[in-house]
């Protein structure tokens, strides 16, 4: 009878120890990098990016943006963003490509700490400047066509022209 009780006590103790060890968190463990980073909005001087939230307590998100994919240029910036899965990034130039990474850390700091786990870089693009309408000039005309010129908009790779026939 004593052996059965001892076995039961040992089984309960092993079970309790297993639960304690399973719930133990390594305070020095690095957080996971966010996935699913994508651009969702663009303005002439800003972009908005979203990502899948990392399921961990006390996460602090950071972003960094650069005009080169290796983040070696002097334009690299980082900014703290607590408990959010979207960030508005401003202060960019119109019609230009940038690279953005989202990072996570449990360290709360004004800039990204050394233990930040960074996502893969994505390319984001700001909206090009608009063509100033008074810069559009007719440079030629034929019986069925016209030629136009205008001052190029910074960062534009195509233009949409809308023509109206006047007097009808």
Language-model regions: role of each:
Residues 12-22:
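Bacterial N-terminal signal peptides
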Residues 55-76, 153-168:
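Extracellular low-complexity, O-glycosylation-prone stalks/linkers
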Residues 1-5:
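N-terminal secretory signal peptides that target proteins for export/translocation
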Residues 82-87:
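Short S/T/G- and acidic-enriched coil/turn segments that sit immediately N-terminal to beta-strands
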Residues 89-110:
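Beta-strand-rich modules
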Residues 34, 51, 63-65, 89, ...:
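An aromatic-rich alpha-helical recognition segment common to small helix-rich domains
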Residues 74-78, 114-115:
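Short, tandemly repeated low-complexity microdomains enriched for cysteine and small residues
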Residues 28-57, 94, 111-155:
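Pro/Thr/Ser/Gly-rich low-complexity, intrinsically disordered linker/stalk tracts
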């Amino acid at each position: 009878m004593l052996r059965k009780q001892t076995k039961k006590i040992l089984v309960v103790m092993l079970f309790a120890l297993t639960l304690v060890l399973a719930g133990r968190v390594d305070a020095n463990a690095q957080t996971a990098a966010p996935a699913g980073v994508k651009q969702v909005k663009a303005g002439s001087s800003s972009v908005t990016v979203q990502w899948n939230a990392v399921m961990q307590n006390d996460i602090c998100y950071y972003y960094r943006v650069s005009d080169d994919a290796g983040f070696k240029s002097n334009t690299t910036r980082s900014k703290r963003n607590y408990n959010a899965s979207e960030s508005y990034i401003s202060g960019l130039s119109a019609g230009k490509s940038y690279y953005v990474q989202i990072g996570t850390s449990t360290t709360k700091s004004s800039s990204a700490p050394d233990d930040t786990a960074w996502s893969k870089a994505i390319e984001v693009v700001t909206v090009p400047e608009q063509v100033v309408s008074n810069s559009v000039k007719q440079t030629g005309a034929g019986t069925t066509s016209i030629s136009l010129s205008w001052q190029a908009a910074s960062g534009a790779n195509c233009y949409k022209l809308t023509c109206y026939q006047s007097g009808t």
